[in-house]
Structure formats: structure tokens, C-alpha cells
Swiss-Prot record:
Signal peptide range in chain numbering: 1-20
Gene Ontology CC annotation, any one: extracellular region
Disulfide pattern: 73-101, 80-95, 85-102
Taxonomic source organism: Ornithorhynchus anatinus
Protein name per its UniProtKB record: Defensin-B5
An example Gene Ontology biological process: defense response to bacterium
Amino acid sequence: MRGLLPFLFLLSFFLSPIQAQPEGREEELEETWSEDRDQAPPRVVEESEVVGAENEAGLAAGRSYPWIILKKCRERGGQCHSGVCSWNEKFIGFCSFARPCCRKRRAVP
């Protein structure tokens, strides 16, 4: 009997009509939608323009983006891995969260 009471309460809660918005609010949303449709379509932007603008803004703000970090890792002679570096590799830095930059260890003469 104890298990039945919470079940009935939840059942009545989910079956009761719930009004999230007043009726007048729906009409306002429909009007806004029709106004948005009348606007001109957005301009198609080249991907290179976006990447260039983001890169310039990021460098000005001092942020590093994944492709910049990957390039730095490769310049150091490393490669980005998932998880951890293997036993025969040396940790150089991080490419991103839980992605270390590793390079092969040099053989000791």
C-alpha cells in the first residue's frame, strides 16, 4: 500500500493538464514568427572569412584554438593522443583536455 500512494500521486501529476503559457502569449509568438519570416535571407559567408576573423580575434585576446595547439605540437615533433602517452613516448604538453602531446623517446647511445 505504501508503494501505491506515490505511484498514484505521480500518475495524477503527469495526467493533470498543465498550462505553461497563458493563451495571449501564443498569439504574440505567432506574430513575432511572421515578422521574422519577412526579413531578407542571411548573407552567405565564406568559411575562410569566419576562421580568419576568429583567429585574429582569438590571438588578440590571447586565446589558443585547437588547430593552433595541434600545429605547435607538430612543430615540437609530437603527435596528439587520446588518454596517455605510451611507454616509449615522452610527454610534451596538452593538445586539449585528456589529449596529451607526445613524441618518441630518443634512443640512449
